[in-house]
From Swiss-Prot:
InterPro entries, sorted: Cellulose_BcsF/YhjT (IPR019995)
Gene field: bcsF
Family, as annotated: Belongs to the BcsF family.
GO CC entries: plasma membrane
GO biological process: cellulose biosynthetic process
Entry annotated with the keyword Membrane: yes
One Pfam family linked to the record: CBP_BcsF
Domain of life, source organism: Bacteria
Annotated source species: Salmonella typhimurium (strain LT2 / SGSC1412 / ATCC 700720)
Protein name according to UniProt: Cellulose biosynthesis protein BcsF
Keyword Phosphoprotein: no
Alphabetic keyword roster: Cell inner membrane, Cell membrane, Cellulose biosynthesis, Membrane, Transmembrane, Transmembrane helix
Length: 63
């Protein structure tokens, strides 16, 4: 059976391990999240490569 002091010791032990690891990993977290997003997520809002065309109704004013 675990007592309250055992639970507090486990919480403090985890805090001593994971807070410094998170602080050290924060600069590379952006790179990791971008890499996983590019690997697993579908690209959105991407237009196919091609020439830029103007709509046929839009015409310049002749002066």
């Amino acid at each position: 059976m675990m007592t309250i002091s055992d639970i507090v010791q486990i919480i403090l032990f985890c805090a001593l391990i994971f807070f410094p690891l998170g602080y050290l990993a924060r600069h590379s977290l952006r790179r990791i999240s971008d890499t996983t997003r590019l690997l697993f997520a579908k690209p959105r809002y991407v237009k196919p490569a091609g020439t830029l065309r103007r709509a046929t109704k839009v015409k310049a004013d002749k002066k």
